[in-house]
């Protein structure tokens, strides 16, 4: 959840649904602040932490939050495939110089954390299907040191501002193969997969990319189910995604 603190040019990012699977969410928000501050100083096109307050996580009234520079909301639309692919390649180049090492595949931990919770939407058999898919797909990931990643580098996390696109929402930053970041966009049907990969340019293992795309879809399934607990409009999408896993289950 984000709150514009008008008239100050500051936006508060407040942890909401993430707390259900990330009890240590403050650590995730701090990693996001640290990385965004590094990228800002490196001249990368990112939404910067607010210079109005210290770049540290704040705890107030039982809420966990961080503070960011306000950017006027853009119009609807996504960047094109060439923009996404080339900007991700450039971002990865800068991220290779980041001295810290965030946890490997950090967002994947959300899936077993969700499946261990009391379910309000999915049945016990649904949980069995998703648990099996998670075990199978994570078993297909190649052991690799990887590099620092955005963590959730979908086209929706590029924001138009001042005639350029800016990366934001680094909360899921982690270490892993570049295929994990690419899959955030190539798994979507909104943009052309082949054009994104061509614009990215650097070699990517096709098998690992397919595995990461399936893990992205699995992650999307559990997040829609989580959102549906407080946003009923997300329920139908969660049900539709779950149906695709049941259909492909052995």
Model-assigned labels for residue ranges:
Residues 4-8, 59-64, 215:
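A short, glycine/Asx- and small/polar-enriched loop/turn
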Residues 16, 109, 113-125, 223-250:
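ATP/Mg2+ or Mg2+-diphosphate-binding catalytic cores
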Residues 71-103:
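Conserved kinase catalytic-core helix
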Residues 110, 212-222:
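Hydrophobic alpha-helical segments that form the core
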Residues 160-210:
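Active-site Asp-x-Gly
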Residues 14-61, 78-91:
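A conserved alpha-helical element in kinase catalytic cores
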Residues 61-73:
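Conserved short submotifs of the Hanks-type protein kinase catalytic core
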């Amino acid at each position: 959840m984000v709150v514009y603190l008008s008239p100050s040019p500051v936006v508060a990012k407040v942890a909401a649904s993430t707390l259900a699977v990330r009890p240590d969410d403050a650590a995730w928000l701090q990693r996001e602040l640290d990385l965004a501050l590094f990228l800002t100083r490196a001249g990368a096109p990112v939404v910067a932490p607010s210079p109005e307050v210290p770049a540290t996580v704040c705890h107030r009234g039982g809420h966990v939050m961080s503070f960011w520079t306000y950017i006027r909301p853009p119009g609807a639309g996504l960047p094109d495939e060439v923009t996404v692919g080339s900007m991700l390649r450039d971002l990865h180049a800068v991220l290779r110089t980041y001295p810290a090492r965030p946890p490997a595949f950090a967002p994947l931990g959300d899936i077993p954390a969700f499946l261990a919770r009391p379910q309000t939407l999915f049945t016990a058999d649904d949980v069995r299907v998703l648990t099996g898919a998670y075990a199978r797909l994570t078993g297909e990931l190649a052991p690799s040191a990887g590099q620092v990643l955005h963590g959730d580098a979908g086209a929706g996390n590029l924001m138009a501002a001042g005639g350029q696109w800016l990366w934001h929402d680094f909360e899921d930053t982690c270490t892993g193969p570049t295929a994990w970041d690419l899959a955030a966009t190539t798994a979507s049907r909104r943009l052309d997969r082949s054009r994104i990969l061509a614009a990215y340019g650097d070699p990517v293992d096709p098998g690992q990319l397919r595995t990461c795309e399936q893990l992205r879809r699995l992650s999307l399934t559990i997040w829609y189910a989580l959102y549906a607990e407080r946003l009923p409009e997300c329920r139908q999408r969660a049900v539709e995604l779950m149906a695709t896993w049941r259909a492909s289950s052995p």
